[in-house]
């Protein structure tokens, strides 16, 4: 990530003051420079009637505050509790003031200036979240732990709502307003902040360059309906914040540099090419080309899955924006939603070409148009990961990881790691009947090769090893992009254990009292700490495999 350089600001200030004191540079009676002019500004206001996005409508939704499983009774919206609890409640008011001050004026006098402002604000939000996670931002007593990832998602939504309601007096077209939202989304996810180094560090050490992705929180429930899903975090997002810009010394003396970004849990941004636009510039040939690209998301209980196969298929689960790309009653690979379709009440209509049951990476990166006409293997129905699985399973990344209350595994500590070789497929791409190839079931060791059966080109994907949701999509797009550039690098997906485990009041979960109104508890935080620590060990394991020249499995 890029951090602002401030070394020269004092010299610039000195020059400015010196110039002001030169002969002929007069001072006004009030101490201001004579003749100084305020920067140009235009009138502005707020349109509080602007239609909010589906996700923004959750900002006013609380956790359950009554009932048998509630101990406290806080009716404050969950978003407000998280943002204040993390000390991020100053970002939206400051953003609003820059957009339109109390006097109804703004120095943002054009679309170009607005684009610059939202880029700056998005990057500042991302950097603050990373700084907090990595101990560079003060955390008051009683605040949420530094490792908490949730404030970034909810603060972003407060700020996109404010941007949506902004009404400058200059003409701002619909497409321009959408472009401002898009730029802010990308900037606040670290997608514009990736900064891979050249081959060698200042001390002569060779760099191994890795990009990782995490995800937003998800399964947040219906806007306006109190539910415990609202308090979900995402360990992949927590990992991204904890590791962005970090460097680790590898076994051969080289340095692993990790750059991180976050992805949304909604289909449209993927369809627009958000992930490829983030990774593509670093996949191109050049002195700072990526050496490994790893996507990360939350998977199942108490296990790390090293995914073998990523599928092209979308399932019927809605994204955070409520939109479904592959309705359950139309779930065939070649199904495409008609433009204007509304897939869930209260959600935006389908507006992007190629929205449907199969993933279509953008032509600008893929090299051909896969959205206009469905073709079975353009791109491939299954894309193979290229992770150094053998080395990762042998690394015993569970060692030294304190197991959270209620967690189980075969390993002595931490969580089990397995090569996840399962997938589901349509034997006939025009028939909804599916078949399953199960995973090998072996933990912390390589399975017998006879238990690993690769898919063939005559079938169509129904599920990758990681399912049919957006984690699988991020994995698929990552490995398809790798192949488009003919890169031979570690590229694959790590599904980390589920983190959203709170006390349930029974001994098996640690014995703590259940409270559906709590935004955090010690069990939840223990899961996050353990998952982030073991994920870090796996990523360093990928770096060590790179240094050893290990081959993918």
UniProtKB/Swiss-Prot annotation:
- Report keywords, A-Z: Signal
Hey, what's the signal peptide range on this chain?
1-28
InterPro entries membership: Peptidase_C15-like_sf (IPR036440)
**What is this protein's record name?**
Uncharacterized protein PA0049
């Amino acid at each position: 990530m890029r951090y602002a350089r401030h070394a020269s600001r004092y010299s610039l200030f000195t020059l400015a003051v010196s110039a002001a004191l030169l002969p002929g540079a007069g001072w006004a009676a009030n101490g201001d420079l004579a003749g100084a002019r305020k920067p140009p500004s235009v009138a502005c206001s707020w349109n509080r009637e602007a239609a909010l996005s589906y996700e923004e409508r959750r900002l006013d939704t609380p956790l359950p505050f009554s009932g048998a499983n509630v101990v406290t009774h806080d009716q404050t919206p969950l978003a407000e509790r998280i943002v204040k609890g993390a000390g991020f409640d100053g970002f939206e008011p400051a953003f609003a003031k820059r957009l339109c001050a109390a006097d109804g004026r703004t120095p943002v006098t054009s679309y170009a200036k607005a684009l610059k402002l939202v880029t700056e604000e998005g990057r500042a939000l991302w950097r603050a979240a990373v700084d907090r996670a990595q101990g560079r931002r003060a955390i008051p007593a009683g605040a949420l732990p530094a490792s908490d990832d949730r404030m970034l998602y909810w603060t972003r939504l407060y700020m996109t709502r404010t941007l949506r309601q902004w009404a400058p007096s200059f003409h701002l077209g619909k497409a321009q307003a959408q472009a401002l939202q898009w730029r802010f989304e990308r900037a606040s996810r670290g997608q514009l902040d990736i900064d891979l180094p050249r081959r060698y560090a200042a001390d002569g050490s060779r760099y191994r360059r890795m990009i990782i992705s995490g995800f937003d929180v998800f399964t947040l429930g219906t806007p306006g309906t109190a539910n415990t899903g609202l308090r979900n975090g995402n360990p992949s997002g927590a990992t991204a914040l904890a590791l962005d810009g970090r460097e680790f010394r590898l076994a051969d003396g080289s340095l692993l540099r990790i750059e991180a970004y976050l992805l949304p849990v909604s289909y449209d941004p993927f369809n627009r090419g958000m992930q490829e636009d983030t990774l593509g510039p670093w996949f191109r040939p050049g002195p700072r080309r990526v050496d490994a690209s790893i996507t990360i998301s939350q998977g199942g209980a108490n296990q790390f899955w090293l995914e073998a196969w990523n599928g092209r298929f979308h399932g019927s689960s809605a994204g955070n924006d409520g939109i479904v790309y592959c309705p359950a009653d139309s779930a065939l690979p070649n199904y495409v939603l008609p433009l204007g379709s509304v897939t869930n009440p209260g959600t935006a209509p389908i507006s992007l070409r190629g929205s449907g049951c199969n993933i279509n990476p953008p032509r600008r990166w893929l090299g051909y148009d896969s959205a206009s006409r469905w073709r079975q293997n353009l791109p491939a129905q299954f894309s193979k990961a290229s992770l150094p699985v053998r080395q990762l399973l042998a690394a015993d990344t569970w060692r030294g990881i304190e197991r959270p209350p209620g967690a189980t595994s075969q390993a002595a500590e931490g969580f089990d790691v397995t090569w996840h070789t399962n997938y589901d497929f349509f034997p006939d791409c025009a028939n909804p009947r599916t078949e399953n190839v199960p995973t090998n079931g072996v933990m912390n060791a390589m399975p017998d090769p006879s238990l690993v059966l690769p898919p063939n080109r005559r079938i169509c994907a129904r599920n990758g090893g990681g399912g049919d949701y957006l984690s699988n999509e991020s994995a698929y797009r990552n490995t398809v992009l790798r192949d488009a550039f003919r890169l031979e690098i570690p590229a694959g997906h790590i599904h980390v254990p589920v983190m959203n485990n709170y006390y349930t009041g029974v001994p098996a979960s640690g014995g703590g009292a259940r409270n559906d109104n709590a935004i955090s508890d010690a069990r939840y935080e223990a899961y996050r700490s353990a998952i982030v620590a073991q994920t870090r060990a796996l990523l360093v394991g990928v770096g060590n495999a790179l240094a050893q020249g290990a081959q993918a499995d």
